[in-house]
């Protein structure tokens, strides 16, 4: 079974439970694209790389662009940088810290440096280890919603670059 299939299975399981995961922290030894450094208003470069990594894990590229190519991280960054993002900022900062801490504990490295199988394991462990209503459950649900909004929403809000998901579903815009 390919990594793409594992990611699709993970995406389906998270959608079924209404939860998902997200992360951020130091990106040890990872190469950060210049576009992340230049394009974010709220996220640090390492946080943006983590969110981008999770968005690609949740919506992997196949014949259509994945979360990374669609620019989901820029949509989420815009939400958090805007006036209505105040309520979510602390949740993202703490949630991303927990994801990266779990990666450090399980595999001795930051989340973005792990392969997709390890990333999936980290997110599944965090999602399933807590009771309903826990901070991780709430964060994963928030992240999932924002990833979906960033992927399928209006490109003018920073995600869905070039209307990629709209083209996928045949929406003319």
Label for each model-derived stretch:
Residues 3-9, 22-58:
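C-terminal segment of N-terminal export signals and the immediately downstream linker at the start
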Residues 15:
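Aromatic-residue-lined binding/catalytic grooves and analogous aromatic/hydrophobic interfacial grooves
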């Amino acid at each position: 079974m390919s990594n793409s299939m594992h990611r699709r299975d993970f995406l389906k399981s998270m959608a079924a439970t209404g939860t998902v995961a997200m992360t951020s922290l130091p990106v040890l030894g990872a190469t950060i694209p210049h576009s992340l450094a230049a394009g974010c208003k709220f996220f640090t470069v390492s946080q943006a790389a983590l969110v981008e990594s999770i968005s690609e894990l949740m919506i992997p590229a196949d014949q259509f662009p994945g979360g990374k190519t669609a620019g989901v991280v820029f949509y989420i960054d815009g939400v958090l940088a805007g006036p209505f993002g105040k309520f979510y900022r602390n949740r993202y900062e703490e949630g991303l810290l927990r994801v990266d801490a779990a990666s450090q504990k399980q595999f001795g490295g930051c989340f973005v440096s792990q392969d997709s199988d390890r990333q999936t394991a980290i997110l599944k462990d965090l999602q399933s280890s807590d009771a309903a209503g826990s901070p991780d459950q709430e964060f994963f649900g928030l992240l999932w919603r924002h990833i979906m909004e960033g992927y399928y929403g209006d490109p003018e809000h920073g995600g869905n670059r070039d209307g990629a998901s709209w083209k996928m579903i045949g929406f003319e815009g």
